[in-house]
């Protein structure tokens, strides 16, 4: 099992690997990256990953407006999901460890579901053991719909123009 970790603390990925190897008696080879753009670059270089584990708090946000943060996060995850396909099985499951404030049924979960991210951990479910379970057995679309508590008619499956730059991205570039 080859996993790309994008969490803000290497101790987290080490703990996940140790727990997974204890639970499933399977070795994990991994790489740690520390920026959203580094995930994309790594996936462009190496298509052999089996799973991607991302901490929502990977990077500090230049803004404390939740809507702006959600748009930034969605744009990054959309770009990552576009690159997340491996040479063997197609799409690489993305496991997102959500922030404290995330709740089931929220608009961001509907958007993430729409781009095929079915493995977000929320609230009390954000544990090393649950990350290990999702690495071993990612959720199906049906399981994700039930876990996220969303209705099919809420989901907007839309293609995003890869050449367009969102207003949020422009503002973050200007601030930086």
Model-derived features: where do they sit?
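Long, basic/Gly/Ser/Thr-rich N-terminal segments
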Residues: 1-173
